[in-house]
Amino acid sequence: MSFLSDLCERASKLDARVAFGESGDPRVLDAAIRLEREGVAHPILVIDPADGAGTAAARKSGLECIDPSNDPRCEALAAALLASRAKHGMTADEAAKLSHDPLAFATWLVKTGDADASVGGAVRTTRELMHFALWLIGPANGVKTVSSAFYMVVPPFRAALAANSSQLSSDSPQADSVPEVLTFTDCSVVPNPTAPQLADIAIAAAAARKKIVGDEPRVALLSYSSKGSGGTSPSIALVQSALQLIRTRAPNLIADGDLQADAALIPDISTRKSPGSPVAGRANILVFPNLDAGNIAYKLTERLAHAKAIGPILQGLAMPVSDLSRGADADAIFHVAAITALQSARFYPSGDQPL
C-alpha cells in the first residue's frame, strides 16, 4: 500500500473533526467535500459572511458550517486573544474584531476541543496562521521551537537511485530502504535557525515522522559540506554543533551531519563522501540549514521532479494546526488535512503523542 493510501486509511478510522478557516476558496471546499465523501475526516467549514459567493458554495455543499459573526463562542475567543496580546498592545476592540476572523475561529475550535485539528494558509499567509496558532494554542510542553515539515512523496525515487547507483538496482534488497516519502524541514517557519533550533527541528521532525509515516527516522543535517570537506565555515560549525546536541538530547535517534544532499540520499556517493555514517545514503529526513535552502528545495523538488508536496505540517504546537502553501491544489489540501488529523493527541494514549 502506498504512503498516501495508508495515510487516508489510518485517518478514516479516527473520525477526526478538521476545521477550515478559508472555506470560500474552491480548492479548500473541494478538499473538504472529498474528506467527507471518502470518510477520511469530518470537515467543519468556518465561513466568512463577507464572502458571499464562498459562503453560498460552502452552505450548498451540505457540510457543517459555522458563522463566527454570530457565534457565542466569539466572546471567549476575544477574551483569550486579549489575555495573550494585551501586553503587546492589543485592545479589547481589536480582540473582538479578530474573534470573528474565520482563521482565528478555526484555531479556537481546536483549542476548545470542538475540533481535533485545523488547516489554513491556502489564501492567508503563514505569518497570519502562525500568529493565531501561537497566541491561542502555543508550543507543546518542553518545546522551544515551533517549525514545519513537508512530506515529499516521490514514487520515482527508487528508479532514479537505481539509475544512478551501480550498487542499487530496482530489485536489489537495498531498494527496500529507499523511502517513498521524504521529510523536508524546516521550509516555512524559522528563517535562520541556531544550532539548538536545528536540533529542535530535527527531533520534532523525527517524532512526527514516526507517527505519520511509521518508519525509523534517519536524519541528515544538510550542508554544502560532507563531514568537514568544506572547511571550517560558520555554517558547517552550526550543523556540527546541532548534531552534538541531537546526540545528547536524543541519543537513540539516527542522525548525522554535515552531509551534502547526494551523500545523504545515494548509497554509492555516501561510501566515498561519508564512509561509516549511520545515515548517509539512507536518509528519510532532510534538515536544511536555513529557510532559504528548505523552501527553495521543496519547491524545486515539487515542480521539477513532479513530487507531491504535502505541508507545511507544523511541528511543536500543543495541538495540531497545519499551514498550506498558497500554491497548493485541492489534492494537497486533502492530504494535509489527513496528516493533521493523525496528529491529534485525542487519538493517542497519554505519553504517546505524535509530537
Where are these predicted regions, by residue range?
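Anion-binding alpha/beta catalytic cores of soluble intermediary-metabolism enzymes, centered on
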Residues: 1-280, 285-355
